[in-house]
């Protein structure tokens, strides 16, 4: 396969597989490519994942940015086998933390926590300054019962994300599971963590320790 060759994403076959033979690891750098990706990201941000997938499938798949979104959208629309196939091929061909992250998240959706941790740890090492990767790795560590390590990863993600997003709840859950009152106080003083958020974190805490390893 020649890197940089544009191709349309293949239709899913009756066996439920996708053709990944034209995967390329190059970044999408052309202005029209960036416009395409921004439009797809906007749909994803609104939760319109089926529409985003349809839009993506109408575009040439001429860069890793397209394939990463393709795998993510396949997973978010319930096509986990196809998503896993895309991400595994990306991992084989591209040394990229985002590919490992995607594969780890597919494993997490399957409730395969240990398999997810393997890939998310590699993603974390490849992309140490990614708040999303550190958050998702920390969340998987919570599911595995590794609360101290999870708290470190999630606090790092919180700081990288400037205190915004779902990591707020995750780090609070980690502190609750560890009985870390000092950490909870820091969330209140440093990041304006409210009592309502704390109550919600207490409710979320009940789900941990129940995942199959």
Roles of regions detected by a PLM:
Residues 2-4:
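C-terminal motif of bacterial Sec signal peptides marking the signal peptidase cleavage site
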Residues 6-9:
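Bacterial signal peptide processing site
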Residues 33, 64-67, 97-98, 131-132, ...:
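Helix-start (N-cap) detector for alpha-helical repeat units in TPR-like alpha-solenoids
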Residues 45-51, 76-88, 110-122, 145-153, ...:
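Structural signature of tandem alpha-helical TPR/SEL1-like repeats
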Residues 58-62, 92-94, 125-126, 159-161, ...:
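Structural marker of alpha-solenoid helical repeat scaffolds
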Residues 69, 102-103, 136, 170:
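Canonical tetratricopeptide repeat
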Residues 155-198:
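TPR/TPR-like (Sel1-like) alpha-helical repeat modules
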């Amino acid at each position: 396969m020649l890197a940089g060759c544009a191709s349309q994403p293949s239709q899913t076959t009756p066996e439920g597989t996708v053709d990944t033979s034209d995967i390329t690891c190059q970044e999408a750098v052309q202005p029209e490519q960036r416009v395409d990706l921004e439009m797809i990201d906007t749909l994803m941000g609104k939760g319109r994942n089926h529409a985003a997938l349809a839009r993506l499938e109408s575009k040439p798949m001429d860069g890793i940015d397209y394939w990463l979104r393709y795998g993510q959208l396949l997973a978010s629309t319930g096509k986990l086998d196809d998503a896993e196939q895309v991400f595994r091929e990306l991992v084989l061909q591209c040394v990229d933390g985002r590919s490992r992250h995607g594969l780890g998240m597919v494993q997490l959706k399957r409730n395969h926590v240990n398999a997810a941790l393997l890939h998310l740890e590699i993603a974390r090492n490849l992309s140490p300054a990614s708040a999303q990767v550190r958050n998702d790795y920390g969340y998987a560590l919570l599911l595995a019962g590794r609360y101290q390590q999870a708290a470190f990863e999630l606090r790092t993600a919180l700081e990288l994300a400037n205190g915004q997003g779902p990591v707020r709840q995750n780090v609070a859950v980690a502190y609750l599971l560890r009985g870390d009152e000092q950490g909870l106080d820091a969330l209140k003083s440093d990041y304006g963590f409210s009592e309502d958020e704390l109550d919600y974190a207490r409710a979320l805490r009940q789900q941990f320790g129940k995942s199959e390893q």
